[in-house]
UniProtKB/Swiss-Prot annotation:
Lineage of the organism: Bacteria, Pseudomonadati, Pseudomonadota, Alphaproteobacteria, Hyphomicrobiales
Protein name per Swiss-Prot or TrEMBL: Probable periplasmic serine endoprotease DegP-like
EC number: 3.4.21.107
GO biological process: proteolysis
Residues the record lists as binding substrate: 255-257, 312-316
UniProt-recorded Gene Ontology molecular function terms: serine-type endopeptidase activity
Biased composition (Basic and acidic residues): 101-119
Length: 513
């Protein structure tokens, strides 16, 4: 082979080898190859385009205020710890969900007798002065400075200060308060100033699971923002006759009381009022007054300084399964009238004990609280059509609504003592009864502790005045009413009882052998 050919051959082999080497760089296997491949295919996640709450908070926070309350304390002596709490605080049971929340407002001990004695100050009079008794939250609802807060924040005060988001402190006066819904309205004393304000939204459109943003003054830290969701609707926590709270899981703590809960449109859907907490801090269970309730109350407070509600004057109780069965009702809805108040609107219209109010102006009544809310929302002087269930049929009764009295005293107790005679036993119910001395009903003298009657709260001294709306005067009358109910296919009988001037209904199941 000639030298020229050998040279060309070598060049060709070299070129092939180089090409193979270069190709091998792209097909390397093993750890190095895996590393290169991983780097080439690194995962990249595009973050979701969520606006968050910053824009909302920026707009609404200037309208949220802190509320400071002071009380004019008259000259006193230092006689150990003294406490100042909202009216009725001492009557709240220890387990009440509001008691721990209220304790933050004014429940601070003033003075210490032992330390004062050591300093030689015991029993020395102190001049009158203003002392802080509460702090909470609120929000401005008008350009001229009307502020909504809770009644329990302001109820024990004489002087009020509103602190704006920028730290400005302004005096305010109390326009009106409504203890029944725990709402109050203040007016900032700054006639030349225009305030940023927020509007009430429609809480009826709020669904469980919707976002909610709370802004307030927890522990004195004004302008604090938390978020969560609506956990439940229509909560009754025993705080008042019109409980209809929205439950939220946004962090709400001491000092948030009276602050707003916003929807994502920046409208107020609730007023934060209470928390449930074994520890005193937020555990994700807070309660807000619905905006629909607040708007009605606030409008009246601004216009009149008080709230006027409709009232029909009835003592009512829930319709239980047994009561529904005893009356032939298909559903456990409505409110059974235990006793109409003498000369009250309901009594004048013909409402009787034992009637079940099932609707108001065509709207179904779910339970006693629903009835109370519906009637309260009707202006005094107007007429309302009440649908009542009486003697196995529905009928409509028109009632003229009256204004609710401010305070109704408790009825005096009435003794049901009976010295008398041989009682008759209703074996099927474990009751022993004797005729009442006044001829109105029969008095229970003994109750079998293992009976259905005992389980349903019937006690010695109770007076049975009717069975299935039939007046009874003897044990025989009771047995006749029970027999009639059994023949008609009823599964229970309805007893009307009186005790301490209070009337109530109890349903007892019919023992069918």
């Amino acid at each position: 082979m000639s030298r020229a050919r050998i040279s060309n051959y070598r060049k060709g082999v070299a070129a092939v080898a180089l090409s193979a080497a270069l190709a091998g760089a792209f097909v390397v296997t093993g750890p190095l190859g895996a590393l290169n491949e991983a780097r080439a295919e690194a995962v990249h996640v595009t973050p979701p385009q969520q606006a968050g709450f910053a824009d909302l908070v920026e707009k609404v926070r200037p309208a949220v205020v802190s509320v400071r309350v002071k009380k004019d304390v008259q000259e006193t002596s230092n006689r150990g710890p003294q406490f100042f709490g909202p009216p009725g605080f001492d009557q709240l049971p220890d387990g009440h969900p509001l008691k721990r929340f209220f304790r933050d407002f004014g429940m601070e001990p003033r003075g210490d007798s032992r330390s004062d004695n050591r300093r030689g100050k015991a029993n020395k009079p102190r001049p009158g002065h203003e002392r802080p008794v509460a702090q909470g939250s609120g929000f401005v609802i008008s350009e001229d400075g009307y502020v909504v807060t809770n009644n329990h924040v302001v109820s024990d005060g004489d002087a009020y200060t509103v602190v704006l988001d920028d730290g400005t402190e302004l005096d305010a006066k109390l326009i009106g308060a409504d203890p029944r819904t725990d709402l109050a309205v203040l007016k900032i004393n700054a006639p030349k100033r225009k305030f940023v304000y927020v509007a009430f939204g429609d809480d009826n459109k709020v669904r469980v699971g919707d976002w909610v943003v709370a802004v307030g003054n927890p522990f004195g830290l004004g302008g604090t923002v938390t978020s969560g969701i609506v956990s439940a609707r229509g909560r009754d926590i025993g705080a008042g006759p019109y409980d209809d709270f929205i439950q939220i899981d946004a962090a709400v703590n001491k000092g948030n009381s009276g602050g707003p809960a916003f929807d994502l449109s920046g409208e107020v859907i609730g007023i934060n009022t209470a928390i449930f907490s074994p520890s005193g801090g937020s555990v994700g269970i807070a309660f807000a007054i619905p905006s629909s309730t607040a708007k009605q109350v606030v409008d009246q407070l601004i216009k009149k300084g008080s709230v006027e509600r409709g009232w029909i004057g009835v003592q009512i109780q829930p319709v239980t399964k047994d009561i529904a069965a005893s009356l032939g009702l298909a559903e456990e809805k409505g409110a059974i009238v235990a006793s109409p108040q003498d000369d009250g609107p309901a009594a004048k219209a013909g409402i009787k004990a034992g009637d079940v109010i099932t609707a108001v102006n065509g709207e179904t009544v779910q339970d006693p609280r629903d009835l109370a809310r519906k009637v309260a929302n009707i202006a005094p002087g107007e007429k309302a059509a009440l649908t009542v269930w009486r003697k196995n049929k529905a009928e409509e009764i028109n009632v003229t609504i009256a204004a609710m009295p401010n305070d109704k005293g408790k009825s005096g107790s009435q003794s049901n003592d009976n010295d008398g005679g041989q009682g008759e036993t209703l074996d099927s119910y474990g009751l022993t009864v004797v005729p009442s001395e006044d001829g109105k009903g029969v008095v229970v003298t003994d109750v079998d502790p293992d009976s259905d009657a005992a389980d349903r709260g019937i006690r010695s001294g109770d007076v049975i005045v009717s069975v299935n709306n039939q007046t009874v005067k003897t044990a025989g009358d009771i047995n006749k009413a029970i027999t009639a109910a059994e023949k008609s296919g009823r599964k229970a009988v309805l007893l009307q009882l009186q005790s301490n001037d209070q009337s109530r209904f109890v349903a007892l199941p019919i023992n069918q052998e």
